[in-house]
Amino acid sequence: MFAPLLKKLFGSKNERDVKRMAKAVQAINALEPQMVALSDEQLKAKTAEFQQRYAKGETLDQLLPEAFAVVREAGKRVMGMRHFDVQLIGGMTLHDGKIAEMRTGEGKTLVGTLPVYLNALSGKGVHVVTVNDYLARRDANWMRPLYEFLGLSVGVVTPFQPPEDKRAAYAADITYGTNNEFGFDYLRDNMAFSLDDKFQRELNFAVVDEVDSILIDEARTPLIISGQAEDSSELYIKINKLIPRLKRQVEEVEGKPTEEGHYSIDEKTRQVELNEQGHQFIEDLLSQNGLLGEGESLYSAHNLSLLTHVYAALRAHTLFHRNVEYIVQGDQILLIDEHTGRTMPGRRLSEGLHQAIEAKEGLPIQAESQTLASTTFQNYFRLYNKLAGMTGTADTEAFEFRQIYGLDVVVIPTHRPIARKDFNDLVYLTQEEKYAAIITDIKQCQALGRPILVGTASIESSEYVSKLLQEAGIEHKVLNAKYHEKEAEIIAQAGAPGSVTIATNMAGRGTDILLGGNWEVEVAALENPTEEQIAQIKAEWQKRHQQVIEAGGLHVIASERHESRRIDNQLRGRAGRQGDPGSSRFYLSLEDNLMRIFASDRVKNFMKALGMQSGEAIEHRMVTNAIEKAQRKVEGRNFDIRKQLLEFDDVANEQRKVIYHMRNTLLSAEDVGETIKEFREETLSATINQHIPPQSLPEQWDIEGLEAALYSDFAVRLPIQQWLDEDDKLYEETLRSKILEQIVAAYYEKEELAGAEALRAFEKQMLLRVLDDLWKDHLSTMDHLRHGIHLRGYAQKNPKQEYKRESFTLFQELLDSIKRDTIRVLSHVQVRREDPAEEEARLRREAEELAKRMQFQHAEAPSMEQAVAGEEEELPEGPAPVVPLEPVRNEQKIGRNEPCPCGSGKKYKHCHGQLD
């Protein structure tokens, strides 16, 4: 009630933030004359001065005005570009660890230089994160002269980079790379066999470009490093042949089936379910083909993997379509990013789904994989001490940024007012009518000499529009996942007079469309251009630029609405950069996916009430509101799925932190002898307790079992029964001490034979190997637990609570297994006198061989949707309030007497800290 009045009196929080930073801008501007007066050498020397002042105790906030003024002056001298006042505000926003929303063409890349330079002065490194390798290399090469002028080093991390190059890139003051590469390197570092093999140092400060794409769109898909598992290619091929015989159950609006079938599809959640008839039918087919035993059920425990294969094949046939969700290139399935329209080489779907699609398309089936290490972007980026981001569209997701990452969004004012006209949506009855209207609009704009950008949601629709334009005799360029190698070239000239460019979603994001085309690309195409040629190209471009401005600027046409308003806003934002004129229009039909699934009934009834005829369009605010309501509903659902993924991964993340902390402690330890001693005593105590319960009578003792267990665990044969027969006074406590003495003595004999140094090195390497093998198996067990946990909802149990409880039990078992298996291996193995360096080199060679066989997946997470479906009654209509999660600090130390972070209630030293 009072919010509008308070906002009117005091301004919005965003306005107050901008006003506060505007005062700091005045201080930076006041320093400009001083900086202009400095020679190049004096300006360069400022970096060393700032570093010394920081070392003596000045904070980065205190250095900010001078540092920003230095970067602004260096930008003028090195690149001929001066930071605008609004760009300084953007730089301060990023330094504060917030998200800066800046419109297309406002110079986000240049803005990033300000906080990156300032934070690099600390010597702890800064990571600049981009969405693809092309942008990482482009931005690094573009800004490198500026940073190097100021005495800072720049590195770029890329896939398949030689280890020494990657290490050098991470050691640089500023490191550019993609979100995937930073995440995978973090996982690889935690699989290293020595500290020298690690790449990353402390995760200090990250500036994430296109932050919405990385932290929102990519948040549902975990990063996975996997190795090959068993080969099931024949099974995929056999089941693939059976799926086309299943029929879909078609339903009316009232929910009654019009045609009996075997499965139903829920397009809202992208789930497919077999019905009772479907289960019986597929069981009969599997039995006939020898895949299921006579009279056996598909739901028997030993047939569950077969059921997984059936569902994977069913999803591949019904939910994944060629040229929409993926393309076939050679003998590979390349997934398409639904948000950018780009292919994602190397990314594979999990749970056998990728293999099922390969079988569907008749391609060679690659072996299934086993998870070796995994994390999510949500948990990886929260490891940084400070996180900031830039994007053209973040305000619609401000709630999620705040709740999940603790990041505020600040909308930065534009340098010049936006002159773009956003027309109301036009809604048609059919897609055919919609596309006809789009072609008419293109012809009209082209006649005026305006450049046109047509945004489509899939390769299929982009090729359909292309076909219609060919039939109409209109010259055009197509930019989709099939032709992505021409992306920069096509986008560069998309602003030429009368040019028509078709792009799937936001392909080309990160490259501005300049009105009149890009004269720099024309110059770059010439070999050794002269000053006269460059001047002529500039003059011709200036004419074209003016011609396009007078015609009305770039016109953006969208062929349908995306699930997210943010993606729609990104497409609109291609027009009207830096105050240029432009316009945008969305063309929709009731047959579009979003309209058909979420909004069609209300709009269809409205159109019928108006008596709409074929070919007519409706343009009304009520229709636009209905569509936006549908989008908000989808956004709310997607937010809940991401939130569910985070809540589930947070459980695994606590365990991951404990294991990785333990691993790093082992790597940095010179000697793990004390740890092995503790393991030996605890394992022995557990073994004896199993056969001689504490405070029990001798009649209850299982001496024969104890002798066998001691040989199994410690490779020592002890005549315990003989001891007891010979000594009546050998009680429980004295017996325990005697057994321990014998086991320790046997181990010391081994040490004398092998040599203390060799055994210490072997202990360390073996402990690492046991830890890695058991952690890998634990990840697989956790995957299976997570995929089936939603079924607990049917037993009136909370799946999340059950997952937390059972995963804690599994983790306790993992810790016990690490101790027991390490002692068992060390007791049984014969250690040769070998140079520890040779042993480490051998293990490193084995690790390198493993690395060659690794697959790096950024896989889908359908199980989270199932988890959501299992708790559907709990989900609110829109985004639900959640408790803000504190960023996880990379160097955080947990006190041994503090409560364990896993939530068990025990002290850390008696729980997950007992292996440190």
Curated annotation (Swiss-Prot):
Gene3D superfamilies named among the record's database cross-references: Helical scaffold and wing domains of SecA, P-loop containing nucleotide triphosphate hydrolases, SecA, preprotein cross-linking domain
Keyword Aminoacyl-tRNA synthetase: no
Residues annotated as binding ATP: 87, 105-109, 512
Cofactor note: May bind 1 zinc ion per subunit.
Keyword NAD found: no
Organism domain of life: Bacteria
Keywords in alphabetical order: ATP-binding, Cell inner membrane, Cell membrane, Cytoplasm, Membrane, Metal-binding, Nucleotide-binding, Protein transport, Translocase, Translocation, Transport, Zinc
One cellular component term from this protein's GO annotations in UniProt: cytoplasm
Known EC number: 7.4.2.8
Reaction(s) the record says it catalyses: ATP + H2O + cellular proteinSide 1 = ADP + phosphate + cellular proteinSide 2
GO molecular function: ATP binding; metal ion binding; protein-exporting ATPase activity
A Pfam family of this chain: SecA_DEAD
Cofactor names: Zn(2+)
Region Disordered, residue ranges: 857-916
SMART domains given in the database record: SecA_DEAD, SecA_PP_bind
Regions of compositional bias (Basic residues) in chain numbering: 906-916
Membrane topology type: Peripheral membrane protein
Compartments, as annotated in UniProt: Cell inner membrane; Cytoplasm
Family per similarity comment: Belongs to the SecA family.
Subunit record text: Monomer and homodimer. Part of the essential Sec protein translocation apparatus which comprises SecA, SecYEG and auxiliary proteins SecDF-YajC and YidC.
Biological role stated in the UniProt entry: Part of the Sec protein translocase complex. Interacts with the SecYEG preprotein conducting channel. Has a central role in coupling the hydrolysis of ATP to the transfer of proteins into and across the cell membrane, serving both as a receptor for the preprotein-SecB complex and as an ATP-driven molecular motor driving the stepwise translocation of polypeptide chains across the membrane.
Protein's recorded name: Protein translocase subunit SecA
Organism: Pseudomonas aeruginosa (strain ATCC 15692 / DSM 22644 / CIP 104116 / JCM 14847 / LMG 12228 / 1C / PRS 101 / PAO1)
Source species taxonomy: Bacteria, Pseudomonadati, Pseudomonadota, Gammaproteobacteria, Pseudomonadales
